[in-house]
Amino acid sequence: RFPFVEIHPRDACAAGVIDGGFARIETDFGQCVLKVIVTDRQQPGMLFVPIHWSDETSSSARVGALVAPHVDPYSGQPENKATPVALSPCDYPQHGFALSRDVLSFPESVWWTRVAVTGGYGYLLASKRDVQWQAWFNEGCSEHDIAEYLDGAGGIYRAASFNGDRLTRCLFVEPSDRTSDWDIIKALFAVETVNAEQRRLLLSGKALDGIASVGPIVCACFGVGRNTICDALKSGAARSHLDLGTQLKAG
């Protein structure tokens, strides 16, 4: 899941940020770039941001760096809830994702966050149009077979690398108003080998025979999707939240 900031609709309107977009949050001590959730469950004049992400798991979501270094004189607890912030929209016209068997390093201007996937590392991405994605991908996969799809005018780039019959890395980048089903690609990434038909259809982003979409991620720690949870409930394999935790590790 994306690192996010929750904001009241009235404050979102005043700041010029929209639900599903990105916002830059700045204080005298640091800044973050986060996905925006506009909701009336948040109090006007207040923001909510989880503290789960670090520099190892996201490019710009370390909330602790924003907080004023004031502590309670007795308990030593930080004054996390009283730091003034400035909020402004941050535009990323391209979104995408990457999967790799190894940890990836992205161009400095790319916004990224790491997500748990089976068999390697998953990343959700956002960027400006000037990032040279094709050059970046080819530089990191020079020793493997590479398949590519490029639509320069449409701002679409998709690529996959293979070591024999094993998918080793893939990248999907497209305009922010389009959404490829990365659940399908994650499922294919989890298997040991891909057949010729799966390899041919991989860059289409469409459903592949024998590979089911897990749906939107509900449990980020173990990469458990909504479809997986619903299937377990419908089949009777799980009848309670305790069953889901035991079988799927979903919290």
What label would you give each PLM region?
Residues 8, 32, 225-228, 240:
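General structural feature for long, well-ordered alpha-helical segments within catalytic domains
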